[in-house]
């Protein structure tokens, strides 16, 4: 496979990862989910719910919940664990996502690539689970199958991006749960919202520019906020894309796309 180069990254010259991701999000169906994946997903959801409860009274969550309540806005989703206060979906995602990572107890994706630091990639559950919860509320509810499909769609997108990207991403100081988690949240929200075609492509481009989190903030309140912001930004990208907001439709690909800029490139072998 030919390699397209810039000074900082090596990426496949003819990759179509953005298109593949958009197609996967649009075409994924509940009936196609393997039973083993559903069993794992149920465990992840239960674990995530426990993490939300555990993180509700953590100082970082309490401060964020108070700020979200003060800012108010359209009451789309509950600030879970904080009474009956309802706030915009993106604000609820920020608070809930942060509570899920407040104690750093959430599950981990283990890499098949020994080059990845500690053999770990990301904490994959909380961003797509949070996006699924808040958007289900914002859109008036979802069936159990719709909810699980959205969650697993986001989970799969997040884990694939984490595995395919070079390990330089984490070594350069990015916190992958905050960065790559944004894609998981976007995919989950977009699936529940029924986004299709170019709205998915633009949404992935938006997500690529919103994905953030740096490791110097480990040990502070801001580390769990990375995951809260991943959930918030993924939801925001989906909502903006639904309205027709535009971005580069191949933002995961190319010499200046997400993989190149934040990860130094992508493994061509893993794409084959």
List the predicted regions and their residue ranges:
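N-terminal core-entry segment
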Residues: 2-272
């Amino acid at each position: 496979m030919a390699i397209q180069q810039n000074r900082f990254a090596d990426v496949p010259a003819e990759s179509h990862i953005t298109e593949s991701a958009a197609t996967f999000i649009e075409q994924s169906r509940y009936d196609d989910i393997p039973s083993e994946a559903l069993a794992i997903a149920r465990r992840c959801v239960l674990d995530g719910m426990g993490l939300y409860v555990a993180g509700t009274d953590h100082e970082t969550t309490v401060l964020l919940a108070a700020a979200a309540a003060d800012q108010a806005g359209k009451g789309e989703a509950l600030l879970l664990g904080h009474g009956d206060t309802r706030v915009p979906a993106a604000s609820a995602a920020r608070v809930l996502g942060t509570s899920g990572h407040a104690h750093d107890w959430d599950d981990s994706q283990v890499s098949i690539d020994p080059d990845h630091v500690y053999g770990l990639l990301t904490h994959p559950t909380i961003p797509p689970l949070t996006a699924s919860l808040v958007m289900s509320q914002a859109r008036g509810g979802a069936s159990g199958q719709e909810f699980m499909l959205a969650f697993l769609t986001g989970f799969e997108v997040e884990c694939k991006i984490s595995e395919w990207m070079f390990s330089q991403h984490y070594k350069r100081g990015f916190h992958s749960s905050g960065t790559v988690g944004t894609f998981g949240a976007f995919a989950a929200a977009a699936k529940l919202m029924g986004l299709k075609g170019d709205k998915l492509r633009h949404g992935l481009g938006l997500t690529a520019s919103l994905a953030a989190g740096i490791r110097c903030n480990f040990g502070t309140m801001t580390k769990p906020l990375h995951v809260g912001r991943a959930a918030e930004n993924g939801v925001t990208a989906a909502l903006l894309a639904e309205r027709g907001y535009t971005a580069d439709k191949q933002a995961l690909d190319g010499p200046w796309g997400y993989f190149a800029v934040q990860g130094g490139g992508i493994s061509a072998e893993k794409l084959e």
